[in-house]
Regions:
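Extracytoplasmic
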Residues: 17-52, 69-73, 159
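Intracellular juxtamembrane helix-capping segments at the cytosolic ends
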Residues: 44, 122-136
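Helix-loop-helix hairpin linking two adjacent transmembrane segments in secondary transporters
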Residues: 146-147, 151-198
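Conserved MFS/SLC helix-loop-helix module at the cytosolic interface between two early adjacent transmembrane helices
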Residues: 68-107
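A generic transmembrane-helix signature of 12-TM secondary carrier transporters
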Residues: 90, 94-97, 112-113, 179, ...
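Hydrophobic core of transmembrane alpha-helices in multi-pass small-molecule transporters
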Residues: 27, 96, 107-123
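Short hydrophobic/small-residue motifs within alpha-helical transmembrane segments
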Residues: 62-67, 152-153
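Cytosolic juxtamembrane N-terminal segment immediately preceding the first transmembrane helix
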Residues: 1-25
Length: 205
């Protein structure tokens, strides 16, 4: 029978609070990076310095660097605090989004998107699923499923918001502001609600 309660003290198991926090946290990397590529691509391709081809290639670089970074992140978060990885990734993504407003050459664009991809990998699914796995032995699949739903929510809520910002403010103003939203949406949630492991607060998974 499914229950969120701890039988011994009739309190909600803190792991479910971790799930709720990760649900919220994943909304921002997915909505402001993964689902926003078409927005950024269209805005960049409209600039004289870039073509549709170079803008599209930058998205490929995002996924390439994200994949490579993910290999290192996966090993790192096994031994260290995933919140550090999440924070570092959010900061990298913030700087990448700010830099998108100032890139003038294709090389600069590729470098910025490489940083963006690394930031996405460090701040999203890998550290998040590592935390959920630490907190759940039973009901792990359900916990992971609930937490990862935040990925889809990002596309539903934050992508339309990004379109509105770009259309009303222009890309050069909107991109840094989107970076601020990424930063503010990820870091406070990580440090206020997430905990490294059940043992760190004296409970059993």
């Amino acid at each position: 029978k499914f229950t969120m309660w701890r039988e011994q003290d009739n309190q909600v198991y803190y792991g479910w609070k971790i799930v709720a926090a990760i649900f919220v946290l994943l909304t921002f990397p997915s909505g402001l990076s993964f689902y926003n590529h078409a927005i950024y691509l269209n805005a960049l391709a409209a600039q004289p310095a870039f073509t549709v081809g170079s803008a599209s290639m930058s998205v490929s670089i995002f996924f390439l660097t994200g994949g490579v970074t993910g290999l290192f992140v996966a090993r790192w978060v096994e031994d260290y605090d995933p919140r550090i990885s999440i924070t570092a990734g959010a900061i990298m993504s913030f700087f990448a989004l700010c830099a998108l407003a100032y890139v003038k050459t294709t090389l600069q664009l590729f470098l910025v998107y490489g940083l963006f991809g690394a930031g996405f990998a460090a701040s999203s699914l890998i550290p998040a699923t590592t935390l959920v796995t630490r907190w759940f032995r039973k009901k792990r699949a359900m916990a992971l499923s609930i937490a990862s739903t935040g990925l889809s929510l990002g596309g539903v809520i934050l992508t339309p918001l990004s379109i509105l910002m770009v259309d009303s403010l222009g890309f050069n103003i909107a991109a840094p502001l989107i970076g601020v939203i990424y930063l503010v949406g990820v870091i406070p949630v990580s440090w206020i609600f997430l905990r490294v492991s059940p043992e760190s607060i004296g409970v059993l998974p």
